[in-house]
Amino acid sequence: AITLTRAFIVYVRPLLEYSTVVWSPSLVRDIDILEKVQRRFTKRLPGLQNLTYHQRLASLNLESLELRRLRSDLIFAYKLVFGLQNVNVSDFFEVRTNTRSRGHPYKLDLPTAKNRTRFNFFSYRVIRVWNALPTETVNFSSLGCFKKSLTSTYLVRFCKVYFK
């Protein structure tokens, strides 16, 4: 099972996660199609057939693809806000200048959407999550520390609180 899991992580998962910051599925059916690949893989491993999907992921030390997409969006947002990408931040969103609000001082403002399609864009997906992050998570001085703070248990708990 360990060899198959490594093969899945090396060969299959990069195909499922290719360009997720640029395009991330927003429709439930599209999310399910991508997640179904990982569900089927974990279901076929010996000894895991009778476990639930989340139990299989935990026993294999894997995360759902949805959580991995959220993490990659947050990491890219961190890179944009702190100037680690050679990209004009104002093309995506505006960093608020008002630092008197609750939470961290790097809050982002949503650009207005003229149609439903823009809600799938990176800037719309990430802003609500980014603005809700606690100060201690956003204020890390290095990207590595920020990445370490985004553990799967933290993201699961965070998503349950803010998005359910």
Describe every region a protein language model picked out.
Residues A1-K164:
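Hydrophobic/basic alpha-helical segments
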